[in-house]
Amino acid sequence: MILEGGGVMNLNPGNNLLHQPPAWTDSYSTCNVSSGFFGGQWHEIHPQYWTKYQVWEWLQHLLDTNQLDASCIPFQEFDINGEHLCSMSLQEFTRAAGTAGQLLYSNLQHLKWNGQCSSDLFQSTHNVIVKTEQTEPSIVNTWKDENYLYDTNYGSTVDLLDSKTFCRAQISMTTTSHLPVAESPDMKKEQDPPAKCHTKKHNPRGTHLWEFIRDILLNPDKNPGLIKWEDRSEGVFRFLKSEAVAQLWGKKKNNSSMTYEKLSRAMRYYYKREILERVDGRRLVYKFGKNARGWRENEN
């Protein structure tokens, strides 16, 4: 038994901690699995309890925040829920996603163990109770602070790498030091570099969701009646056929179950990056932010 920071931690040495995700509660709230919390967003729930749709949202978030080409992560290989995802080894991630598998594996391990992209967000003053006597954890890890989504200490790691070499075998992740995981046989075996995929920092084909939306607006003849400008000079636009746009995006991402509800949730990731803005009080209406490029009439 370990007493630290006003908390109690009971550890059974007979259990394998690699497969026992921790469960945190803070001084304000407690989230129980039986309370129906499974309907939340992916960053509010421990990865083991994600639905397959939350798994896809996590994958899309990694694509967008790391400026990866869509071909780096084949969504059809991840038609699984969080429990299955958490059981995958590094070798299985690499087999499913090529060289991007190491990024996915490292990010997932960090989320499983820390719940935030910056470990100092968990202060020792929190009341922590971790019980690992049973094979199935009884409490879901919740994250109340959404700022970790764009934490510069983690989210920008890949941006610091040469964009031409990211999707190769040597991907350096700074999160390794945070993982309480010894080198496994799977890590030792993973030596052969899979096929390359390429990253384009400014992709005119709409690799990222906001670019996809922009390109529909810029080419109305190819996709008529889907989205229209409300105020071109201000970058304000409206979805006319929201579900049709979602299906088109799902086809591009090999995700046949894409809906506008999921697409709109993905669009929220661009708010903090000031690429998209929400127009209050107007349904289906959005605006390009100051960091969006290529939508202005006189822009090169």
Swiss-Prot record:
GO cellular component: nucleus
Pfam family for this entry, one: Ets
Region (Disordered): 183-202
Record's keyword annotation contains Transcription: yes
Record field: compositional bias (Basic and acidic residues): 185-195
GO biological process: cell differentiation; regulation of transcription by RNA polymerase II
Any GO molecular function: DNA-binding transcription factor activity, RNA polymerase II-specific
DNA-binding region location: 207-289
Comment text on domains: The PNT domain acts as a transcriptional activator.
Biological role: Transcriptional activator that may play a role in regulating epithelial cell differentiation and proliferation. May act as a repressor for a specific subset of ETS/AP-1-responsive genes, and as a modulator of the nuclear response to mitogen-activated protein kinase signaling cascades. Binds to DNA sequences containing the consensus nucleotide core sequence GGAA. Involved in regulation of TNFRSF10B/DR5 expression through Ets-binding sequences on the TNFRSF10B/DR5 promoter.
Family that this chain belongs to: Belongs to the ETS family.
Name by which UniProt lists this protein: ETS homologous factor
Organism from which the protein derives: Pan troglodytes (Chimpanzee)
